[in-house]
């Protein structure tokens, strides 16, 4: 794609970035997004108290508030505010390599996709849990699963299908389910790769990641019944695969991680399916 045609296409794309206390991650994310030159950058804040808004104001952004109502609401507020045909949902923990947004949009339009996510290269901190999370995401099958970390949609698709606001996590899985059920083409790019950063390097951070995954899978079962029940096996399958790969690669240091991953997922699933209230987030 020529530079001129890139400019024309990106002029019809809005980037939506939902944020909540993302001051550590947002500067590099916004710098990379701004460099790409989309028509609009919409930052939707969830009652941040750490300087996130001050950072957002340093860039040519439209700033909205979701009132702390969560990611599904934040993303849809951004989509509704967009004035362009295409919308890219970019999380604050993503950094876009130069030219990646135009390449992803070119692949999206050429392939007739309803939604296309960039491939993810995950990185973590230098400690055990940061490295473990990153290696799991780089080596696990989930890296090829469609999500909304760095994903382009037709704006009209999101306005029509949208997110289920009742989901506090796993809304990406639920959206993927409904898009696929509706016969829409979705995918993950193998040509355009972006950096995905874990903003934590502690056991408590990893535990929260596991809990969010488990709650999301359980919420799918609660909504979709037996059709979603097979999702309950995913953490066990991922843990077994991770253990076997760790042993085969002579990397036993990751075994505790996969045990904690499975236990954390299933404890959160049980709480969600039992209807127990989750702890309020800080």
Residue ranges, per PLM feature:
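Non-catalytic, C-terminal membrane-associated alpha-helical segments of glycosyltransferases
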Residues: 208-216, 222-282
